[in-house]
């Protein structure tokens, strides 16, 4: 049996979806994981990298990636982190998507990004439990 693949998507793939990918990789060994965006940035948000390091998860090797049809087709479950603009919203391109509607960390203070990180961690751990119960 092929390992189920989980895909986290947002617009820039520089913050929220990268946090989710980092937590998911750390806590879910029965699944593959990746993240992508419809308009990916060239690098990760440095504050996001910093707040993930604070909890012992190094995401410096993760890179923003362009969302592709293959990623969507290969995904067992796709999670949209939320949209900062409707024209580029990944949920427009994915039929079966779970939308978490999480605030974008772009331009936020480190304290605000920590709260976003913690919210994403809670959502990821809840998702892992549900997925493990389903397989």
Per-region residue spans from a language model:
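Conserved active-site segments centered on acidic
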Residues: 1-69
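Short glycine/proline-enriched coil/turn segments at helix->beta-strand junctions
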Residues: 28-32, 74, 92-96
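Structural signal for conserved beta-strand scaffold positions within catalytic alpha/beta enzyme cores
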Residues: 35, 80, 98-101
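Alpha-helix boundary/capping detector
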Residues: 50, 78-79, 105, 123
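Mid-chain, well-packed structural core segment of small domains
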Residues: 64, 70-93
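Phosphate-binding/catalytic loops
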Residues: 86-135
